[in-house]
Amino acid sequence: MTPPTRMGPALLLLFFACISWSLAGAAAPVYDTAEVVLHSAQTFDGNSGTPNPFTSVTLTLTVVAPDGRTFQVDGFFDGNGAGGAVGDVFKARIFLDQPGTWSWTSSSATSGLDGRSGQIPCSGTLPGLFAKGPVVVPAATPRYFGHADGTPVLLLGKMLDFDAPPAQFTTFTFFSETFSESERRAELDYQHSLRVNTMAIYLFNQNDFNDDGPRPTNPWVGGDRTRFDLAHWRTFETWTRTLRDEGMVAQLWFFADDSGVGGFSMADRLRLIRYGMARLSAYANTMFVTTLEWEEAFTASEVDQAGQYLQSFNPWRRLTSVHGLPGLFDFPNASWANYMDLQIGILDDWDGNHQDALENRALAAKPSFCQEFAQGYESGFSRIKAWSVFFAGQAGVGSGAYLAWLAEFARTVPFQRMAPADSRVVSGDAYCMAESGVQYVVYFPLGGTALVDLSGASGTLDAQWFDPRTGQWSSAGTVSGGGTVSFTSPQGDDDMALWLRPPSGSAPPPVLGVAFTGRTGFDWSDTRDATSYDVVRGDLAVLRAQRTFTPAVNACLENNGTDRHAEDPVTPASGQGFWYLVRGVSASAGPGSYSIGDAGERPGRDPEIGASSAACP
């Protein structure tokens, strides 16, 4: 791992930002959404007549963040501003990812909208889960998701739930105009009861999931795809905010399958994408999928066009993907696809799902979200499928059963440090993931006995069983690393998971998720067994010239600091730079390592740093 760096004024500054919104001059918290409201000189009718405000008016804000970053933000027509079609209201939304004063200037060829400007103060913390920031792909763990503050997250959803009442067969129809507000409230409460954190929702659907009657979601005014139904969009955004405030990711899908999208012009498709991004992407909890089963309505080149177009109107860098028919993800190397949204054999057994998920994960070093692989029946079969997919190193699991206990397991076990390691299972029916030489998790789909190769580990490992049916942990004693060990499930032929980890008295593992939060400060991920942290700073030019850390270390910024944040008020000289490294410290076992064990790291980092008189003691 290359140490995180902070450069002088002439060079690049690497950081993560924080965002918020304000209203009537009040400061908005970090990661909230600010809304700029402008009024045109002319009144427009969004439902009929000319000119059509959705096709004839363009509004762009140039937004400057407190640290100087500049964003081009698309505005949108919003009728009377409250869901009515007739009015002079145009809006633009700003994702405030950094405390301080944000400024904006408008440009438009439409009278009343051009040359306006303002400022938005941002301070404080957004309540709830998204105080951690939006879901991103952390540089330190590129195959998994995390929040912007470095906290790892396994996305869990129940997109299909055929055991539920008809109105709750799927989350996709959540925005349908056929549902009442109370029905939507009941559906969200039901999702909370499952302890999932992600809902897949259509922005357009005509015929999908209509077995109990039509469940359309129409973003347009009737069949006129040049005009948007502003009352419907007000519902979309209101519930998107509600999901955010209640800790739920809104994974928004522009187009459903089985809905005639193949007959739409590309201009109509792109218009929906642009309008949807303008209205919804500034909310911290949003992610996007262009279409379900793209092969039914798009060519491969049209998918590429749509993905690139979406990213051109994605100033807040929301994650996006596309969903195909069962099989391999078709666009693993596309720059617009931030993650791979998968459909694998929905009627296959769990081992088929596991192998398919592994094959897809190997396509690219980006998150693989196994979305569609089970019908969601609350059965042992669906549960085993979900765990088998998770043990293929998936960053998200979109269906399955007993998901509350998979969520509990993922919150406890640092899965983001692990990779699939089925080769560690010498014999027996089991799957394995490992942080090589440190810790292992093993899943027994049918219980039984498995022989596991622990030759990469040394010393004693604590062993704990986890019951996927009840969420209960139980001790399996200790085992010794350095060889093969046999494990037998305590629940006969029922599925069980096993966690093998260093004893709690061991030194903490490497610190991950180091990310700048401004020009002078940076955070890092919570690290198992660390009760405090040491942070060292060094001179980048000296490290490059002498190729050793000892002479390059110039400060211990924190020694046994108890938070996960460090500030450095010293600015490098122009053309120069600093590097930073963090290690966890255990109250009982002492300090961990400044190294994270990447293959590209040369050995000796810790003793070299320790030999410097400027290093932390």
Region locations from a protein language model:
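Bacterial N-terminal signal peptides
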Residues: 9-20
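Aromatic- and carboxylate-lined catalytic core of secreted/periplasmic carbohydrate-active enzymes
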Residues: 28, 45-48, 151, 359, ...
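Active-site mouth of glycoside hydrolases
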Residues: 58, 129-339, 344-349
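Short beta-strand elements bearing conserved aromatic residues within extracellular beta-rich modules
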Residues: 59, 461, 533-535, 580
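Extended acidic/polar, glycine-enriched regions
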Residues: 69-71, 75-140
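Pro/Thr/Ser/Gly-rich low-complexity, intrinsically disordered linker/stalk tracts
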Residues: 505-530, 590-617
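Beta-strand-rich modules
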Residues: 531-532, 571-592
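Recognizes extended acidic, P/S/T-rich segments that occur
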Residues: 534-575
